[in-house]
Amino acid sequence: MALERTLSIIKPDAVAKNVIGQIYARFEGAGLKIVAAKMIHLSRAEAEQFYAVHKERPFFKDLVDFMISGPVMVQALEGENAIAKNRDLMGATDPKKAEKGTIRADFADSIDANAVHGSDAAETAAVEVAFFFPGLNIYSR
């Protein structure tokens, strides 16, 4: 088992529903530590840069529009196999297909407004964590 860090974003739909604490409780209940966190309202440029990997995909504009529609809660999570653990907690991208008891099954409305983002691999996690928390703004505990 490997100690890993991953990025998690609680998206505008879940922030608006006031379920940040419930989602944090799930992270902590699964043994993940929140080692950095901040609430921000992404600019269009920030959202486009963060999701640049999807720039050529048909959903890119809608994704960016959604991500700038309200504040988001961004956190770096740390723990054993944090990337896979967080992805299991999130559930399938489409909340209709997400397993009961996952974050998306419980809090998401649609495949677009799907409550959370999580890094999908160690390489992307490193880039995504550095995007939001450059330098020494992460505190292992």
Curated annotation (Swiss-Prot):
Places the protein is found: Cytoplasm
Catalytic activity: a 2'-deoxyribonucleoside 5'-diphosphate + ATP = a 2'-deoxyribonucleoside 5'-triphosphate + ADP; a ribonucleoside 5'-diphosphate + ATP = a ribonucleoside 5'-triphosphate + ADP
Its EC number(s): 2.7.4.6
Residue numbers binding ATP: 11, 59, 87, 93, 104, 114
SMART domains: NDK (SM00562)
Any single GO BP term: CTP biosynthetic process
Cofactor names: Mg(2+)
One Pfam match: NDK
One term under GO cellular component: cytoplasm
Active-site residues annotated for this sequence: 117
Primary subcellular site in the record, as a coarse category: cytoplasm
Gene Ontology molecular-function annotations: ATP binding; metal ion binding; nucleoside diphosphate kinase activity
Keyword Nucleotide-binding recorded: yes
Uppermost EC category: transferase
Signal peptide (from-to): none
Subunit structure of this chain's protein: Homotetramer.
Stated family: Belongs to the NDK family.
Function as written in the Swiss-Prot or TrEMBL entry: Major role in the synthesis of nucleoside triphosphates other than ATP. The ATP gamma phosphate is transferred to the NDP beta phosphate via a ping-pong mechanism, using a phosphorylated active-site intermediate.
Protein name as catalogued: Nucleoside diphosphate kinase
